[in-house]
Amino acid sequence: MNSVNSIRSTFLDYFQLNGHKIVSSSPLVPRNDPTLMFTNAGMVQFKNVFTGLEQRPYKQATTAQKCVRAGGKHNDLDNVGYTARHHTFFEMLGNFSFGDYFKEEAIFLSWNLLTKEFCLPEDKLLVTVYHNDDVSTELWRKISGLPDEKIVRIATADNFWAMGDTGPCGPCSEIFYDHGDEIWGGPPGSAYEDGDRFIEIWNLVFMQYEQVNKEKRVELPHPSIDTGMGLERIAAVLQGGHDNYDIDLFRALIAVSQEITGVKATGDFIASHRVIADHLRSSAFLIADGVLPSNEGRGYVLRRIMRRAMRHAHLLGAKEPLMWRLLPVLIHEMGQAYPELVRAESLISETLKLEEIRFRKTLERGLGLLSEASTDLKEGDHLNGEIAFKLYDTYGFPLDLTQDALRCRGISVDVAAFNKAMEGQKAKARANWSGSGETVTEAIWFSVRDQLGATEFLGYETEKSEGILTALVRDGEIVDDISSGQKAILVVNQTPFYGESGGQIGDSGTISGKNFVFEVHDTQKKADGVFIHIGEVKSGQARMSECVELTVDGVRRKKIRVNHSATHLLHEALRQVLGSHVTQKGSLVSPDRLRFDFSHPKSVSLEELEKIEDLANEIVLQNSEVTTRLMLVDDAISEGAMALFGEKYGDEVRVVSMGNRLEKGKLKSRWSIELCGGTHVERTGDIGLIHIVSESSVAAGVRRIEALTGTAARLYLSRQDARVHEIADLLKTSATDVEERVRILLEDRRKLEKELNDERKKSVLSGGIVKSDQEDITIINGISFMGRVVKNISPRDLKTLVDSGKKKIGSGVVAFIGVSEDGKGSAVLGVTDDLTHKLNAVDLVRILSGILGGQGGGGRPDMAQSGGPKGNKADEALAVLKASLEG
C-alpha cells in the first residue's frame, strides 16, 4: 500500500532527482508575511523569492509544507469532521521554479509523476486551464495526449492566481481525478462540479505577469512556477478511496480513539472521531511551533481547535483527557518527517492534558446551560446571542463551539446579539478603566487594544519577523505618519520585541519599511497585551498599515537572556543557603548586569555569598536544558514553582525549569522552577559564569545582590586579578601572599595606633596636646572647670580622659571636645558626684552640642556626650559653656 509517508518521500525524491532542492517545511507561524495568521500554502516561505526581495542559492525547490487553515479568511474549522476533505491541518506537496523552467517542464514533471511514478490511470485524469491560456492547452495535448474534452477551459478566478492587488500573478492549471460515476458530481465548469466525483489533486500556477495596478498587467521577465498538491487527497486516491479520513494516517489515529473511548466510528460518532484526529494534528504542530493556547490571536485559534475536539471527546463519553493519549500514535506516524514533534513531545502532551483538564471543569456546566436554553428550540431557530456570550464569557465556549454543538439539530446562533453583548462588555471595561487614574496617553493603548486586539508576541521563537503598522503615536496622539527625526511610538500587529515585564527590560532594535528606518530604544507592554515600540525615525517616513520588518538587537537580547536565567539560579541558591523564607521582592534584568532583591532579616556574610555563587555555577556547569511549559497556576505552585513578586497571573502560566537535582546519578527533579514570561537561554551552560559583585540593604528585611554573568563576569574577575597583582607589587610580595601580608600590616598598624593613642591620652592629661589656652583649670563661681580641645581622640577615649580629669580636679566640671580629621566635633562632659545635685551633665553637654551643630545630647547627670559637624567651633563651644556657668 502507498502509505502517507511513502507518498511524501516519493514526491520529494522525484523532484530531487529532477534537479530540485528539498527545502524543509517552514513553521506554521509565518515570519515573512504578517498578513497571514498561519502558513496555509507551500509558496508562503518563498513569497519574497517570487517578488525578488530575497535570493536563494537554488532556482528549483520542492517541499512538503505543513499548513493550517483555521481562523482568518482561510478557515475550514466549521466543516472539519462533516466532509471528506476539510482539515484544519494538512500537508501541501509542491515544486517551485524561480525564473528557471516554466510551463512545459512543469506540465511534463507533473504528468510524469502521476502516471509513471504513482501509476494513476490516464483515463482517470482531466485538467483545467485558464480560458485564454492557449499555450498551456497545447502543451497538455502534446505531453499528456488527453482529448480536448478532458482539457477544460475555465474563465473564473479559480484558474487565475494573484498574490494580491498588485504583484506576481498568472493562470493556473488544475489536475483532477475522476472517482467514477458511482459517486455523484460533475466535471469542473459544470453545474455539478461541487460533487465529490471529480477531485482536484494538483494545482499548477504559472506566474507570468506582474499586476502593476488595477488596469495594468505586464509580462514578468523571469516567469516562475508554484504548484501545490494536497498530500491527504493524493493519498486517498493512491490508497483506493475518495475520503481523506480513510487514509492510513487517520485510520491509525481513529483506531486509538475508538479503543480508548470504546465507541466505534459509525453513525453519528464518525464526525467526532474525525474531529479529534484532525484537531490533534493541528494542535500538536502548532504547539511544536511555539503557539500556546491563550485568549488572543493565534493562541485563541489553537484554544478553539482544542476545545472543539474536547467537546467531541465528551460526546464519545471520555471521562479523562483524551487527546494527549493519541499523541504517541501521531508521533509514530509523522515524527520522522517532522522531528519537531519528537523534540516537543513533552510540551505538546502536557499542554493538551492541561487544557483538557482546565476546560473539563466548565464543559459540562456550559453544556447543561446550552441544553436548558435550547430545549424549546427547533430546526431553523436561533439561540439567543446573549446565552452564547455567557457560554463564551463564563464557561470558555468559543462561539464556533456553541455553533457546532447546535449544528446537528439545525439550530444557529444569533451572532449579531452575541457581538452586541461582546461590545457591551468592552464598553464596561473601558468605563472601569477610565476611572483608574491613568494618564491621557495611557488611554490610547486601551483604545488600540479595543479596536485591534493584543499584539502577537513571537519573541520566544525568533528575533526577526514582519508585521503591519497598526498605530503610530506622536506627542500623545495617534497620527497617520511620522517622519525622520521625530520621536514616536509604533504598534505592530505582531512583534519579536519583548515588552518590559517581570523585571526584564524591553528589547531594542530596528523597525524598517519600504521608505523608513525606525530605531527602537525600548519596548513596553500596555493595556494587557499591546506592545509599544518607543524610539525615533532615523530616516524616511512611516505610514499607517505599512508592512514592516522588525529586527531585535540580537546581541543585547542574548545578554538579557543570560542574565534572566542567572537570576533564576541565584534565587534557588539563595533559598538553599539562607533558607526557604527567601522570596523575591524585585529584580532588574538588563544586558549589563542583574539585580535581585529578596527577603532576609540581616546582611549576607561573605562565606554565604560564596556558597550561593558556587551553587549557581554548579548548575551552569551542568549545561542542562532549560525548558518551558504551560500549566495551571495552582498545579505549577503545587509542583514547587516560585512566582515573581508583583506579577499578576491568569489561570494558565508559563513555567521555566532549569538545572537537575540528581540522586544516585539519576534525575530526581528540576533544580529551579519558576513562573516566568521572560526570555531565557537554551541551556544553563550558555550563562558561562555568575559572579556576585555586591550585597546591600534595600529596606528593613529586604536585601539586594548584584551580579555579572558571562563575559562581563570574566572581565570583572580579570580586572580584579590585575589589581591584586598591582597591590602585590606595592607590598613587594607575591599575589598568593597578599592576604597574609595585608593582615600583618593591619596588625602592625593596630599596635602603632594603640601606642599613639596611649601617648595622646598621657599628653592630654599632662596638658601637652592643646588647641587653646582654655585648657587650664579655672574657678567659676566657686566651681573648678577643666575644658580642653583635642585632636583625633575617639569618643570612648574622651570618656576615659573626662574620668581622669574629674579625679585630677577632685570637685568640678570637666569638658573635652575631640575634633576628628573630617572636622566633626565630639563632646564629653562630666560633673563630679558632689555637684550633681545642682549641675546636670546632660544639660551642660547640650550647650556644647548647640554650638557644634548637633541635635542635643544624652547620658547621666554625672556623664553625658554629644557632637556635631562643626568641629571648627570647639573653642567657641567651651567659651559659651564657661559663660553659662558664670551665669
UniProtKB/Swiss-Prot annotation:
Pfam families: DHHA1, tRNA-synt_2c, tRNA_SAD. It is an enzyme of class 6 (ligase). Residues 854-873 are annotated as: Disordered. Its EC number is 6.1.1.7. PROSITE patterns: AA_TRNA_LIGASE_II_ALA. It catalyses: tRNA(Ala) + L-alanine + ATP = L-alanyl-tRNA(Ala) + AMP + diphosphate. It is found in: Cytoplasm. The keyword Ligase applies. Keywords: Aminoacyl-tRNA synthetase, ATP-binding, Cytoplasm, Ligase, Metal-binding, Nucleotide-binding, Protein biosynthesis, RNA-binding, tRNA-binding, Zinc. InterPro entries: aa-tRNA-synth_II/BPL/LPL, Ala-tRNA-lgiase_IIc, Ala-tRNA-ligase_IIc_anticod-bd, Ala-tRNA-synth_IIc_core, Ala-tRNA-synth_IIc_N, Ala-tRNA_ligase, Ala_tRNA_ligase_euk/bac, DHHA1_dom. Binds 1 zinc ion per subunit. One of its GO terms (molecular function) is zinc ion binding. Zn(2+) binds at residues 564, 568, 676, 680. GO terms for biological process: alanyl-tRNA aminoacylation; negative regulation of DNA-templated transcription. Its cofactor is Zn(2+). One of its GO terms (cellular component) is cytosol. PANTHER family: ALANINE--TRNA LIGASE, CYTOPLASMIC, ALANYL-TRNA SYNTHETASE. HAMAP family: Ala_tRNA_synth_B. Catalyzes the attachment of alanine to tRNA(Ala) in a two-step reaction: alanine is first activated by ATP to form Ala-AMP and then transferred to the acceptor end of tRNA(Ala). Also edits incorrectly charged Ser-tRNA(Ala) and Gly-tRNA(Ala) via its editing domain. Consists of three domains; the N-terminal catalytic domain, the editing domain and the C-terminal C-Ala domain. The editing domain removes incorrectly charged amino acids, while the C-Ala domain, along with tRNA(Ala), serves as a bridge to cooperatively bring together the editing and aminoacylation centers thus stimulating deacylation of misacylated tRNAs. Belongs to the class-II aminoacyl-tRNA synthetase family. This is Alanine--tRNA ligase.
